Amino acid sequence: PGGVCLLLLLLCQFMEDRSAQAGNCWLRQAKNGRCQVLYKTELSKEECCSTGRLSTSWTEEDVNDNTLFKWMIFNGGAPNCIPCKETCENVDCGPGKKCRMNKKNKPRCVCAPDCSNITWKGPVCGLDGKTYRNECALLKARCKEQPELEVQYQGKCKKTCRDVFCPGSSTCVVDQTNNAYCVTCNRICPEPTSSEQYLCGNDGVTYPSACHLRKATCLLGRSIGLAYEGKCIKAKSCEDIQCTGGKKCLWDFKVGRGRCSLCGELCPESKSEEPVCASDNATYASECAMKEAACSSGVLLEVKHSGSCNSISEDTEDEEEDEDQDYSFPISSILEW
């Protein structure tokens, strides 16, 4: 009798261990309540939930691979999904996030950056070229979807470097879309290893590499832009210039040079687009429509100012004043940062 009891005890222990191991660990529970994204099979709930992830879930069924495949592909996930975390207790969401119970009484990690040490309460311009109402709003955007987002300067994003105060040793530069950015100029450019690295700038100067063009742009404080790849040549027309990457040569009659530009862009049918006055003194429905006309004619067109050619804003006059003082070439040139 003693031997039988011992055998039964061992059998029960074996079944208990097997049931503890049988189960599947999943990385999330979907809105339909099913487990999705299989992490590992044959794990106990304790082992699965020890990862500490808020979204980790577990299913008890020890099923074969065919059933798992059907669940994931045809059924929207595994049924009888058990979330590892039912409350916010002992949930570590990481820096800048906090665990809160949502409307369905489920724990969720939400963005909650520490904004207590922020001294500047006004709007800021982010590295993405967008204006945020304050630095705390920018930190929330960084937490949600843009981990590399930072403040580049205080105040709203501007179209000119006037009144832009860049932090540290960075310098204000106007890019090809006429937006002001703070960049660092003191980079060391390596010597080119191949003649294929040469670039012709929109200023007619040959640069040894893209790094040299970026540095020259930075020191100048506004966009120089890339005309075409290779050394600058004395072209008489666009027929002398070979464009790469699906670009088309547009001729700039003002300076007698060609420039390779991207064409074929479809203009969106949006009523929010602002009309622009182009360098041919014609008004276009949008900047995209102007580029479309330029690609069609083969003649380079630049934005003189926003709005129709019959109206000139004060900001435009300021920008034109800056252009005469600093640089005689167009500021809306293409700059490949």
Curated annotation (Swiss-Prot):
- Cystine bridges: 25-48, 35-81, 49-84, 88-99, 93-109, 111-143, 115-136, 125-157, 161-172, 166-182, 185-218, 189-211, 200-232, 238-249, 243-260, 263-295, 267-288, 277-309
The Follistatin-like domain is annotated at 87-110, 160-183, 237-261
Q: Which Pfam families match?
A: FOLN, FST_N, Kazal_2
Q: Which GO terms describe its cellular component?
A: extracellular region
Query: What are the residue boundaries of the Kazal-like domain, all occurrences included?
Result: 105-159, 179-234, 254-311
Would I find Transferase among this entry's keywords? no
Which PROSITE patterns does the UniProt entry name for this protein? KAZAL_2 (PS51465), TB (PS51364)
**What does the subunit section of this Swiss-Prot or TrEMBL entry state?**
Monomer.
- Function text: Binds directly to activin and functions as an activin antagonist. Specific inhibitor of the biosynthesis and secretion of pituitary follicle stimulating hormone (FSH).
Protein's name in the database: Follistatin
What species does this protein belong to? Answer: Ovis aries (Sheep)
What gene is it encoded by? FST
